[in-house]
């Protein structure tokens, strides 16, 4: 919960009436919200990342929210995302990919489940809030685990399993043993050539619904002279606007390419390169299509792909990839 610093200004209004003097005092509260702290402190509430009750997940006014056109699948968990930049600093565009962040930037992502997708008034359960903080040119990762009362989240390095039950949009009750990753797990996916890096907010992934234009308008990003030169990663669910191939490649990029690319965790284990911009003939998708299918069709711990972040098959995602592989 954000701490509000309240300054009380007392205005003395003096009125003279005959020989009597009446003095009225008016208290006017002026509130200032403290800036977020770019450190991994023990409790999430200490970082000033949210204002109001912590469980509301209302971002600090010093931040900006963003969404991704094709997000990572994490056992149907919802995600709340925002970025905090240090005062007076901006992002710097680098092609269509990840922008350059100034030191003391914070990337915040909270994971939660609505108890009933058809009745949001039933509330939600927040599981974890992940942070990436840039300090002295290097990104550090931290994961805050939420308590049952939803009043605080505590910095943890170890993995944890959190049982969750929710009702999906079809009215079906779904039980999930949500896996909170360890700090080492986080680094596994976020590391490339032994350097921790952000994954989500690439320019091509936020270039829709005027998000990128709003960043330009708000002076939160520099280096874009013509927004039309920034490409857009396809929305894997939008079959009206994008081809099966483009949607499948986008899904593989977001869910698999962090490890399956040069310098990634699986670089020395396989020739697969799932980055969207990689030419098809250089991806090894055709040669490995049988293996790709076998790793996605059923969930087997330590065998299924993605290796981390899921505990069962993403039915809709698998159907997309299976349909795509059948065309090859």
Task: Identify the residue ranges that each predicted region occupies.
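Short acidic-hydrophobic surface loop/beta-edge motif
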Residues: 9, 99, 109, 164-166
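Sec-dependent signal peptide recognition
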Residues: 2-10
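Conserved small-residue
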Residues: 26-95, 101, 108, 112-115, ...
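Generic hydrophobic alpha-helical membrane-segment signal
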Residues: 4, 36, 241-243
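C-terminal motif of bacterial Sec signal peptides marking the signal peptidase cleavage site
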Residues: 13-16
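Sequence context surrounding c-type heme c attachment/ligation sites in exported
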Residues: 18-26, 30, 117-328
């Amino acid at each position: 919960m954000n701490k509000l610093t309240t300054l009380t200004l007392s205005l003395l209004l003096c009125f003279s009436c005959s020989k009597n003097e009446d003095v009225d005092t008016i208290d006017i509260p002026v509130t200032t919200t403290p800036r977020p702290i770019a450190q991994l402190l023990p409790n999430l509430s200490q970082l000033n990342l949210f204002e109001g009750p912590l469980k509301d997940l209302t971002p600090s006014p010093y931040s900006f929210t963003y969404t991704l056109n094709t997000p990572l699948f994490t056992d149907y968990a919802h995600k709340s995302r925002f970025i905090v930049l240090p005062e007076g600093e901006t992002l710097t565009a680098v092609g269509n990919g990840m922008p350059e962040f100034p030191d003391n930037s914070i990337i915040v992502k909270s994971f939660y489940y609505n108890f009933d997708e058809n009745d949001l008034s039933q509330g939600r359960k927040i599981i974890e809030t992940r942070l990436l903080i840039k300090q002295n040119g290097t990104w550090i990762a931290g994961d805050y685990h939420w308590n049952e009362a939803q009043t605080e989240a505590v910095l943890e390095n170890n993995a944890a399993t959190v049982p969750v039950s929710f009702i999906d949009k079809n009215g079906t009750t779904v039980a999930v043993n949500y896996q909170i990753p360890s700090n080492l797990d986080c680094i596994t996916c976020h590391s490339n050539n032994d350097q921790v890096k952000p994954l989500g907010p690439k320019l091509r992934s936020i270039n829709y619904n005027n998000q990128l234009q709003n960043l330009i308008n708000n002076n939160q990003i520099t280096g874009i002279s013509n927004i039309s030169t920034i490409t857009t990663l396809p929305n894997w669910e939008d079959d009206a606007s994008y081809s099966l191939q483009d949607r499948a490649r986008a899904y593989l990029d977001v869910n698999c390419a962090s490890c399956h690319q040069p310098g990634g965790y699986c670089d020395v284990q396989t020739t697969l390169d799932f980055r969207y911009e990689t030419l098809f003939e250089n991806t090894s998708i055709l040669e490995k299509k049988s293996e790709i299918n076998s790793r996605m069709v059923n969930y087997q711990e330590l065998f299924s792909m993605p290796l981390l972040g899921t505990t069962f098959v993403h039915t809709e995602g698998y159907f997309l990839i299976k349909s795509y592989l059948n065309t090859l």
